[in-house]
Amino acid sequence: MRRTGLRFLLPYMRPYRRDLLVGSLYAMIGAGASAYSPTLLGRAIDALLAGITPQHLLAYAAGIVGLAVTVAIFRYLLRMLTGAIAAGVSYRMSQDLFETMLGFDQATLRQYGVGDLLSRASSDFIYIWRFYSAGFQMSLHAILLLVIGCALMALTSPPLALIVFLLLALSVALQFGLGPGVERSFDRVQQEMGRIAAFTQEHLSAARMVAAYGQERAAVAAFGAVNDVYARRGLGFAMRSAVVSSLPGLVVKLAAALVLGLGGAYVISGQITPGEYVQFIVYLSVLNGAAQNLAGAFERLQQGGAAAGRIGEVLRRRPAVADAPNAVSLTSVRGALRFENVGVRNEGRWALHEISLNIPAGSTLGIVGATGAGKSTLLGLVARVRDPDEGRVSLDGHDLRALRLESLRRSLAYVPQETLLFSMSLRDNITFGVPGLPDERVHAAVDAARLSNDLPQLPQGLATVVGERGATLSGGQRQRTAIARALARDPQLLLLDDALSSVDASTAAEIIASLATDTAPRTRLVVSQRLASVRDADQIIVLDA
């Protein structure tokens, strides 16, 4: 997963190659200054023991302070640079992810679950951000500091440096060996987080029904079961991560014990000076910090790789319905539809089979039938929510699959069974997709949908914010708002999928009459359980499950 995830990240890093080179330079300067500080301190101690003037001692002190300031400046510059890279990469990736998810069909959405996709689009991006910002900065600085530090130690005492190097190499090898297990554990944690998000989203959406059936305790118990699995996964990840993150500190302390003993013997025998001995001790302290930072960066690498793998899995999914390479746009649409031996399979069975229809432009087709007979599927074919498995559907003589999706969907309005409104004003919901619509068009659509009488009851009329999914409106008001939104587009194709099921019979009759007297050259496909809603249609078909 990590390798796949990191390969997926590479294209997003290419625009920042120059920044990465500059960041490497910043890290090299900062690491070099940090690594040279113990050397300067050791020389100052040796000079002090040999007897130097206060002016020389002050020069050493100024040099150490100057190195510390240099480290701070270049670490700051590196952190700012990597933060900017993280922001840019996260922005591009989140845009791509959102665009990809909007193109998913219902089958793909059901496969992942909305909650899981929300988890990938939110919490996974936190780990991508941490990888690019803190993880990259920490790992680059720590690796350079370890390399430069070991090189400077080797110039002072190769045997002591070899001990430190071998122990650090052992630590890194153990981290990489245990890393895949940590990543798999983290991936399982993220999967369970997706399950929690899905469970929460589903039950909050149905909160009123849960309360109406008195199932609050059962829902809490069910959430507890899901949460328990998440907690156990999280504990497993924490234990594995703790083992990996504690290795560098343990190794450096072991190296310190060996250097203290062996280095002391070297001082006594005169192989190294007291200043060089102190220099080694300080180096171990510096390398300990670098090793701890490297462990933290390695953890971010594991988490970022797993998160990138989960996001990449979604981005690699191609939509089931997409533009053909040679797709064309229609400059004008009359609205003549034709179904030719159309068949659609759902889970191995025919939802529609051998359907042939000819719907003249400007006519109305009424569609009735039992639940599960394929009425919604039929409308979905016109909107290209999905494509037929057999036969073809054509608009004005053009196979729908040969048309650009944008061109097709610009010419139609689709009101599905489940009314979906956004948490914005009623007017913004009605003008969704047609910004800047004149007031006359808005009020005409409101009148046709018989929504005018409801406006005085709303606190701010058309400016009233309807809440998430239109929660502040009744079911009938939501459906009529959706119809007004469809009419505001002035489409050539109007698809109504049982769009009046929550509207009372008299108001529904008024809306049907309004649509029947509509003089716009519009082709209408109306699905309804009420025969009264389709009795004036030019054609009526009955679908049998």
What do these predicted ranges mean?
Residues P15, D19-G32, A134-R188, V259-T273, ...:
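Transmembrane helices of ABC transporter permease
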Residues Q215, M239, V286-V314:
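Cytosolic ends of transmembrane helices, especially the final helix of ABC transmembrane type-1 domains
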